């Protein structure tokens, strides 16, 4: 991968990561970007003049596993390099979950017909309150949770990648056309929402993407929808605070300055639970650079 030989290795609990910078042109995103998220991040990054956190990349395939929007914003800012944490994606300790869309509605029946209109072209199924099956479908399959008089889970069992992408984008387009508030939550948070039976909350998500489906994007060039995967690593790196000006320099100069910055910093382990950017992290450790 690339010509950069300078790498800062860290071993956390027998899970090895390598910290370095790589050429942006050598990396492969596996997801599309959300323009709203990118616009907000772009403004903040330009104002600060630095990238806070490195992205995470599979060292075998050069596929970006975490940090698609940071990658996209550095491209927009004409940077040549990006700070990365290299990992071995074959490790069983790296897990893949999915992000789920949480939609706030005054009256879910207003978009119910639109949702069924989208699904009628496919061999969908419906579940009503069969808890164990319900949770399995939320985690594994493409689904929509409708909290109507009789709550319903509409789902498509193991759709192919193209069908999955079409449906996720179609559902998102309904939400955006109605100008409804939407946020992203985890699988565990989604199950808690279903248990609450809040009649003003709709949930939907695509199928859970597998590791081979993530890597295959490099060959197929068809990206998964934005926020499709939620990767969970044993450890993540925070606050490298890399100046953007370094990432625009010629290769040798950029690499040397980047590693000079790392050598001057101290790193410390944050054991879960810990707080980062107003989020309580419970699933992995953090390495904080100061």
Residue spans for each PLM region:
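Short active-site-adjacent helix-start/loop capping segments
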Residues: 64-66, 74, 92-96
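Short alpha-helix boundary/capping and kink motifs at helix termini
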Residues: 2-63, 69, 75, 79-80, ...
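Solvent-exposed functional surfaces
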Residues: 86-290
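Short, charged/polar micro-motifs that form catalytic or ligand-binding hotspots
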Residues: 59-64, 200-204
């Amino acid at each position: 991968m690339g010509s950069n030989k300078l790498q800062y290795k860290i071993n956390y609990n027998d899970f090895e990561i390598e910290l370095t910078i790589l050429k942006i042109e050598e990396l492969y995103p596996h997801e599309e970007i959300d323009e709203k998220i990118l616009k907000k991040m772009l403004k903040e990054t330009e104002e600060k003049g630095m990238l806070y956190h490195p992205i995470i990349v599979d060292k075998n395939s050069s596929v970006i596993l975490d940090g698609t929007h940071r990658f996209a914003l550095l491209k927009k800012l004409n940077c040549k390099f990006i700070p990365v944490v290299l990992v071995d994606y074959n490790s069983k300790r790296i897990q893949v979950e999915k992000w789920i869309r949480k939609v706030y509605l005054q009256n879910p029946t207003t978009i119910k017909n639109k949702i069924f209109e989208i699904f009628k072209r496919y061999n969908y199924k419906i579940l009503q309150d069969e808890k164990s099956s319900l949770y399995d479908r939320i985690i594994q399959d493409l689904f929509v949770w409708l909290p109507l008089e009789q709550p319903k889970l509409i789902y498509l069992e193991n759709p192919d990648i193209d069908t999955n992408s079409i449906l996720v984008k179609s559902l998102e387009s309904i939400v955006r056309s109605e100008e409804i508030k939407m946020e992203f939550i985890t699988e565990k948070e989604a199950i808690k929402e279903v248990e609450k039976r809040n009649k003003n909350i709709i949930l939907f998500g695509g199928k859970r993407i597998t590791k081979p489906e993530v890597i295959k994007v490099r060959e197929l060039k068809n990206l998964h929808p934005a926020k499709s995967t939620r990767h969970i690593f044993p450890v993540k790196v925070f606050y490298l605070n890399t100046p953007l000006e370094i990432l625009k320099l010629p290769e040798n100069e950029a690499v040397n300055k980047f590693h000079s910055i790392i050598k001057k910093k101290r790193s410390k382990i944050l054991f879960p639970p810990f707080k980062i950017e107003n989020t309580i992290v419970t699933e992995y450790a953090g390495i904080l650079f100061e």
